[in-house]
């Protein structure tokens, strides 16, 4: 079990509300729905009202730094069933990528594949004490749009299963040429901008994903507590249906 799942939850009871903010765009059609995920009539583009308010604050910070840029929301609320769908889908992708036969996987092979899957996907737990971050309505995956409305190149794709997903990958990556070195520097600066604007509103970034931010869930509280051992917090957003 991941350590953040040991954090206690005392849900504050805030409802979910649609993401409808100036300077914040939604990726449509939703990428998981394209893959076949069934949201059963629910929208992935909702957040707890308190989280939504803070996202608006982050957008204002972005406007101060890059006035023409916008936030693009890739994903937000994710029901447990959709979490399970994406875990299964990614498992199948790895099996196909590695040329394996799904019906004849050994126990060790399955274990290895799930280790890769759970690098970017939380376990689709139905236990209310250990909810996936996105099922709380307090986590979202985002990137940036430039002044022409095009996605800003962040040096990696959202949900990418590679070392490039690490937030500070380009800080330590070895460039093979001066132009590539400048390119890596630009990617790192853009990721730092994304983090700066979200942190200014109280969000904290996932340690292994440059695109994932949350506020008030177990992962957020766990990260906060690592840096403030004398001011421990519990999560105030749990699973929401």
Task: List the predicted regions and their residue ranges.
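Cell-envelope/glycan interface and biosynthesis
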Residues: 2-211, 216-239
